[in-house]
Amino acid sequence: LSPLVSAQNAVSKLSKPDQAKLWLAVGRLNVTDGGFCTATLIGRLHVLTAAHCIYDAETGTQVDVERLEFRAGWQGGQAEAYRKIGSIEVHPDFSFLGQTGLQRVSSDLAILRLLTPIQRPDINPFSVAQMPLKGAYVAVVSYAHDRSEAPRFHDGCRILGRKENVQVFSCEVDYGSS
């Protein structure tokens, strides 16, 4: 979301089966005839992603839910679970065409309701937690335009602070990581 780069971060591909199993709730949100974004299961029926991911960049309109599919644990051309989207709830302050910079980033959130729940016991939804404090370390797992077939694990991302209601951290993010 905010491309701050730090060479000290350890970045690795989630290729070890034991390591990848911890992150099966992270997946790709695919748009038919479009792109993709990182998305995360936050309940058996709900996925969190960036709001801009569900808009058509050419028209500025929200894409039809029929064009969206969540692929949990996507790696090497396969997912652990495939789910179509039933409905979309975009953050009320988000405007695809009317915002830029940190104002846009702070409200760039959407919750997608799946048509059917993901009930597998090995795919555990992430809980939504409080924002970590400055100085804390977090991990970021995401896909991006240059690594669309397997997520990357960014370990040791340090929280640098907050600016205009946006968490700023030391990890590199790229298109698709949202």
Residue map of PLM features:
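Short conserved beta-strand and strand-loop elements enriched in small hydrophobics
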Residues: 27-29, 65-76, 136-142
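Chymotrypsin/trypsin-fold serine protease catalytic domain
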Residues: 106-109, 114-176
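Catalytic histidine site
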Residues: 24-69
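Terminal peptide-recognition signature
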Residues: 29, 39, 45, 49, ...
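Extracellular/periplasmic catalytic domains that process cell-envelope and extracellular macromolecules
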Residues: 19-22, 41-42, 61-64, 102-106, ...
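Short, small/polar residue-rich loop motifs at catalytic or cofactor-binding pockets
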Residues: 33-36, 174-178
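Conserved catalytic-core segment of clan PA serine endopeptidases
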Residues: 8-21, 55, 61-118
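Protease-domain processing segments flanking chymotrypsin-fold serine proteases, especially trypsin-like
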Residues: 1-42, 152
